[in-house]
């Protein structure tokens, strides 16, 4: 079956856009072909900095013939209805329609419309221009003669003004080939703003800029590689990672791996060449995180460390070039080294300035007094400055200083709940946001918290306070580590709860896929801390909003489900007012263990049967009594069940009060045999109305007994 090869070659595409753009191209093209009746066996997208490529295998040579029946009006319909039918069906005369008889509806017209299949070449040429013109780039531009004002022309190309092609960077050539796997392929001709699709591509911009004639995908890939272009981005990543590790190892070093940077640099080169640069060892006095970010952000280079070292860095870095230089890369290394040293010099300047005094300490005394700050210490000065400048946190939620004051009050209440030292918690809170006014964080915002910790250690803060300054931002996702120290746990909870309560108060809640303030992440962080650090916190005591509590419930469900818990078991123990998430999780754990055992499964069946019978009666308007009359218990099975319910209810309630949910489940398991015996021997719908009502009350007692730990009616299976 025929294959299709499409290449869109342009100036350099930003690395961050390449992978998604290639995926978009695949989806848009394959969807358009399938929509027009062309199926295929497989498709794969490729990308380099200068091209998007699509390889579609096993594409039908033509679309299938289609036979449609279009139902029309009755044969005795008025002329206007018949004319409308003819127009819609594309018929010239009613004699071209067929008449069908229906015993109920009478005779009516139908039109048989036969649509012959079309050659794939025709369909491809038809869909490509529209796909390219409407391509969903995040940012795009107009370029070339076609972007000139309408009415003007250049080199035979007419200006189209705003109607000209928008592409991420100037589009230079298009390859579009279709044909059998082994025979000659043909060019599918179409034109985009003077660019004619053909069979010519070009290799590496510097090493092999000449034209390459393409026949099919295999020789396209091999000829590009001869022309110093590796088409497969994942292969470029593998080459970069392998060669970088080897080069580091050869110099007695280890590569500090960075998946995000690896993805980016693989999108900056078509022919990756791995080189090593150096900088002066004096710069190693700067924190390793600043060095890594400086080199990564400004030069897209990897850092290294000594072999076997867990911390610290070496003074050598790995750079990736797109040129196989004749001098072995000496000039490239020299040029990158100059820039790296200049950037590290700036970083050292930030680092040193952040440890010095601010020039306007007199103006900070009021803020210092408000937060009990010591203006002899650099980090305290930065916190005072943050407050004095009235830096806005959110237009409706006040300044950063006001936010810290709120977190301070909340943390004061949370400290005894967590078991943290109140004085250390207070000190950690007032310094937690101070590094937002440091120059290092101003240059690299992703270092907030971490730099605060380093500056706190330098000014002699307690180890728990320093750790809390960094860790109060954690966890920042489902796999991020949690704060370990109790002081850090307290500040992290206070920070996240203040954010959530505040945004709920101003009605800035997540909607659909939109969550600009990362409130879902904050709520999940609270859930993880409470459950994984065994913190008992009644959320309604701090988040006095039922809707916010419901939001926590949703995050809890997601978290527990990811751990393997069943949704129905979570729902069975969760009530709208449940605000102790740790206890909810423990109930789910105990219920899961109980329900997977034989006693649990059988009791569940009996309890659900009782609930269904009660629901049917209550639907009829029957009012079921709250208590059971022992004198109306006539049969041994119902007497035994009532005695078992009284014992099990008392034992389960006592266990729940002691938060021993496994024992509560064990107490309920004793009901299994009496419930089974009751349904075997007892007819609930007795002829005697009083006995019947009493037996319904007994069923209600079963429901209430099991309800001490869960709502069994919500459990499936």
Curated annotation (Swiss-Prot):
Top EC class for this record: ligase
Gene Ontology biological process: arginyl-tRNA aminoacylation; glycyl-tRNA aminoacylation
SUPFAM superfamilies listed in its UniProt record: HD-domain/PDEase-like (SSF109604)
Highest rank taxon of the organism: Bacteria
Pfam families with a match to the protein in the record: DALR_1 (PF05746), tRNA_synt_2f (PF02092)
E.C. no: 6.1.1.14
InterPro entries: DALR_anticod-bd (IPR008909), Gly-tRNA-synth_bsu (IPR015944), Gly-tRNA-synth_heterodimer (IPR006194)
Subcellular location(s) per record: Cytoplasm
GO CC, any one term: cytosol
Keywords: Aminoacyl-tRNA synthetase, ATP-binding, Cytoplasm, Ligase, Nucleotide-binding, Protein biosynthesis
Entry GO MF terms: arginine-tRNA ligase activity; ATP binding; glycine-tRNA ligase activity
Catalytic reaction annotation: tRNA(Gly) + glycine + ATP = glycyl-tRNA(Gly) + AMP + diphosphate
Complex and partners: Tetramer of two alpha and two beta subunits.
Family: Belongs to the class-II aminoacyl-tRNA synthetase family.
Xref: HAMAP family: Gly_tRNA_synth_beta
Name of protein: Glycine--tRNA ligase beta subunit
Species assigned in the record: Agrobacterium fabrum (strain C58 / ATCC 33970)
């Amino acid at each position: 079956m025929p294959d299709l090869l499409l290449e869109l070659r342009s100036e350099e595409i930003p690395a961050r856009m390449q992978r998604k753009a290639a995926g978009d191209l695949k989806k848009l093209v394959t969807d358009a072909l399938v929509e027009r009746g062309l199926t295929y066996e497989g498709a794969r997208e490729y990308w380099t900095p200068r091209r998007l490529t699509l390889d579609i295998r096993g594409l039908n040579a033509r679309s299938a013939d289609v036979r449609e029946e279009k139902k029309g009006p009755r044969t005795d319909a008025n002329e206007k209805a018949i004319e409308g039918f003819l127009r819609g069906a594309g018929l010239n005369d009613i004699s071209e329609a067929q008449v069908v008889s229906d015993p109920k509806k009478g005779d009516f017209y139908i039109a048989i419309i036969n649509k012959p299949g079309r050659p794939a070449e025709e369909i491809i040429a038809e869909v490509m221009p529209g796909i390219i013109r409407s391509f969903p780039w995040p940012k795009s531009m107009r370029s070339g003669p076609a972007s000139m004002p309408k009415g003007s022309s250049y080199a035979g190309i007419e200006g189209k003004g705003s109607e000209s092609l928008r592409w991420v960077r100037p589009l230079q050539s298009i390859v579009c080939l279709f044909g059998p796997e082994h025979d000659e392929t043909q060019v599918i001709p179409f034109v985009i703003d003077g660019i004619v699709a053909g069979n010519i591509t070009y290799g590496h911009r510097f090493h092999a800029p000449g034209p390459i004639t393409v026949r099919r995908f295999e020789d396209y890939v091999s000829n590009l590689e001869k022309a110093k272009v590796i088409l497969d981005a994942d292969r470029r990543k593998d080459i970069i990672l392998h060669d970088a590790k080897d080069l580091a190892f050869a110099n007695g070093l280890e590569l500090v791996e960075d998946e995000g940077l690896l993805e980016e640099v693989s999108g900056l080169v078509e022919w990756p060449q791995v080189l090593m640069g150096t900088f002066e060892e004096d710069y190693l006095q700067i924190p390793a995180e600043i060095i890594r970010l400086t080199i990564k952000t400004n030069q897209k280079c990897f850092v290294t460390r000594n072999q076997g070292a867990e911390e610290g860095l070496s003074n050598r870095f790995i750079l990736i070039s797109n040129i196989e230089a004749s001098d072995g890369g000496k000039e490239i290394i020299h040029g990158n080294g100059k820039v790296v040293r200049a950037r590290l010099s700036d970083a050292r300047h930030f680092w040193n300035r952040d440890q010095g005094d601010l020039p306007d300490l007199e103006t900070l005394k009021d803020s210092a007094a408000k937060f009990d700050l010591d203006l002899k210490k650099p980090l305290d000065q930065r916190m005072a400055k943050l407050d004095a400048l009235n830096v806005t946190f959110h237009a409706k939620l006040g300044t950063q200083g006001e936010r810290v004051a709120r977190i301070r009050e909340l943390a004061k209440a949370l400290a005894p709940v967590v078991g943290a030292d109140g004085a250390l918690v207070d000190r950690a809170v007032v310094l937690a946001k101070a590094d937002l006014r440091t120059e290092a964080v101003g240059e690299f915002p992703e270092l907030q918290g971490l730099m605060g910790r380093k500056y706190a250690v330098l000014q002699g803060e307690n180890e728990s306070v320093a750790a809390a300054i960094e860790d109060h931002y954690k966890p920042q996702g489902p796999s991020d580590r949690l704060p370990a120290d109790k002081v850090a746990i307290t500040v992290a909870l206070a920070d996240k709860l203040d954010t959530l309560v505040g945004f709920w108060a101003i009605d800035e809640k997540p909607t659909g896929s939109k969550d600009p303030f990362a409130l879902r992440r904050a709520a999940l962080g609270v859930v993880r801390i409470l459950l994984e650090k065994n913190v008992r916190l009644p959320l309604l005591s701090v988040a006095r909003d039922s809707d916010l509590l419901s939001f926590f419930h949703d995050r809890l469900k997601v978290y527990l489900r990811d751990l393997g818990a069943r949704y129905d078991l979570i729902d069975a123990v969760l009530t709208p007012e449940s605000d102790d998430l740790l206890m909810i999780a423990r109930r789910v754990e105990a219920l899961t263990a109980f329900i997977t055992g034989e006693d649990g499964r059988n009791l569940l069946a009996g309890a659900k049967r009782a609930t269904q019978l009660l629901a049917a009666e209550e639907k009829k308007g029957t009012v079921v009594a709250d208590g059971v009359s022992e004198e109306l218990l006539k049969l041994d099975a119902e007497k035994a069940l009532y005695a078992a319910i009284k014992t099990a209810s008392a034992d389960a309630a006592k266990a729940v009060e002691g938060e021993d949910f496994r024992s509560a489940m064990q107490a309920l398991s004793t009901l299994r045999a009496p419930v089974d015996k009751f349904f075997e021997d007892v007819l609930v719908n007795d002829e005697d109305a009083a006995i019947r009502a009493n037996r319904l009350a007994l069923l209600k007692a079963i429901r209430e007994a099991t309800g001490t730990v869960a709502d069994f009616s919500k459990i499936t299976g």
